[in-house]
């Protein structure tokens, strides 16, 4: 019971996490070019940027060169890079602005990981020139965003249970309520519905829904992000040395973040216990390699049920 309480405390801390944003209207769309006042907000890390579009459109309406634009025409960018609207804002920050200063230029390294990109995180919003090659268009009713979220929930449900029957059999009210609870950052309502989908604590997942994001160098000629995903059981398979040792005690050994990273990315994580070349980052914090992956998912998943870990190079 005490262990479960600890996981619940971690989940509450995750949902309480916020990120200060400073959002400016693109100078190309502003009547006053770059003189428009920015929009400042402390925004939940688990939330999605499109939820801000109605209030941003209203805030910038008097400055828009094209006042006939609609809120759902809006899209966000950071340093000229369009931001994927289906990813939570906390993940986007960890990907694009949370890199070590040593990897962001020729200046001396600093212990302050936000030295290169001090908070608030500065974003640009535009309501025209949608980047069709990089982003799927949104709609006025918000159904595109809703459907993308639910599809991601289905994928996570399938990973955990080997079937998406749980989310498919949710009532329409609960399905809509799950998305609304994330939009409203309403953890009690979210827990009530998500607990229907999660196996009970004494029943292990079939696989854990985790994706690893690998930022690539700008001159790689490839997309700026690479995603690594593979079925990860919550306990070590019999072929591993640790599992062989566990066979003696007949106690399954938990799959830790270190064993998972070593199996999937051995060149970046040659050690199962200690980060040597890279480190795993979730919700802006470096995770311990000893963390059992199922506990990480139960306590620290985003609203869609996935854990999105950013692999950040060291040094």
From Swiss-Prot:
Which Pfam families does the UniProt record give?
ATG5_HBR (PF20637), ATG5_UblA (PF20638), ATG5_UblB (PF04106)
Q: Keyword set for this entry? A: Autophagy, Isopeptide bond, Membrane, Protein transport, Transport, Ubl conjugation
Q: What is the location of the Glycyl lysine isopeptide (Lys-Gly) (interchain with G-Cter in atg12) cross-link?
A: 154
Task: Say yes or no: keyword Transport present.
Answer: yes
GO cellular component terms, alphabetically, are: Atg12-Atg5-Atg16 complex; autophagosome; mitochondria-associated endoplasmic reticulum membrane contact site; phagophore; phagophore assembly site membrane
Q: How does it sit in the membrane?
A: Peripheral membrane protein
Where is this protein chiefly located?
membrane
Which processes are annotated in GO (biological process)? autophagy of mitochondrion; cellular response to nitrogen starvation; piecemeal microautophagy of the nucleus; protein transport
Compartments reported by the entry: Preautophagosomal structure membrane
* Post-translational changes noted in the entry: Conjugated to atg12; which is essential for autophagy.
MF terms in GO: Atg8-family ligase activity
Q: How is the subunit organization of this protein annotated in UniProt?
A: Conjugated with atg12.
**Function, please?**
Involved in cytoplasm to vacuole transport (Cvt) and autophagic vesicle formation. Autophagy is essential for maintenance of amino acid levels and protein synthesis under nitrogen starvation. Required for selective autophagic degradation of the nucleus (nucleophagy). Also required for mitophagy, which eliminates defective or superfluous mitochondria in order to fulfill cellular energy requirements and prevent excess ROS production.
Family per record: Belongs to the ATG5 family.
What's the protein name?
Autophagy protein 5
**Provenance organism:** Aspergillus terreus (strain NIH 2624 / FGSC A1156)
Q: The organism's lineage? A: Eukaryota, Fungi, Dikarya, Ascomycota, Pezizomycotina
């Amino acid at each position: 019971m005490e262990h479960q309480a600890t996981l619940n405390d971690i989940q509450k801390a995750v949902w309480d996490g916020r990120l200060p944003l400073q959002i400016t209207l693109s100078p190309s769309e502003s009547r006053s070019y770059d003189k428009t006042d920015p929009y400042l907000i402390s925004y939940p890390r688990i939330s999605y940027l499109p939820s801000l579009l109605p209030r941003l459109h209203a805030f910038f309406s008097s400055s828009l060169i094209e006042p006939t634009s609609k809120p759902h025409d809006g899209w966000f960018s950071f340093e000229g890079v369009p931001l994927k609207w289906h990813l939570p804002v906390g993940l986007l920050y960890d990907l694009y602005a949370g890199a070590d200063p040593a990897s962001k230029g020729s200046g001396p390294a600093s212990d302050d990981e936000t030295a290169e990109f001090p908070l608030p995180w500065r974003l640009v919003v535009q309501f025209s020139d949608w980047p069709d090659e990089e982003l799927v268009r949104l709609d006025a009713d918000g159904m595109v965003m809703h459907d993308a979220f639910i599809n991601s929930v289905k994928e996570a449900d399938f990973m955990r249970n080997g079937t998406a029957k749980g989310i498919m059999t949710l009532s329409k009210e609960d399905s809509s309520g799950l998305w609304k609870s994330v939009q409203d950052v309403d953890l009690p309502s979210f827990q009530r519905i998500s607990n229907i989908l999660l196996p009970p604590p004494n029943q292990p997942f079939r696989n854990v829904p985790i994706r690893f994001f690998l930022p690539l160098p700008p001159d790689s000629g490839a997309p700026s992000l690479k995603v690594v995903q593979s079925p990860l059981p919550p306990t070590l398979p019999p072929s591993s040395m640790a599992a062989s040792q566990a066979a003696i005690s007949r106690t399954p050994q938990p799959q830790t973040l270190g064993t998972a990273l070593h199996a999937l990315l051995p060149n970046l994580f040659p050690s199962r216990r200690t980060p040597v070349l890279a480190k795993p980052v979730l919700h802006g914090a470096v995770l311990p390699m000893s963390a059992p992956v199922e506990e990480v998912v139960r306590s620290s998943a985003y609203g869609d049920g996935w854990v999105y870990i950013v692999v950040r190079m060291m040094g």
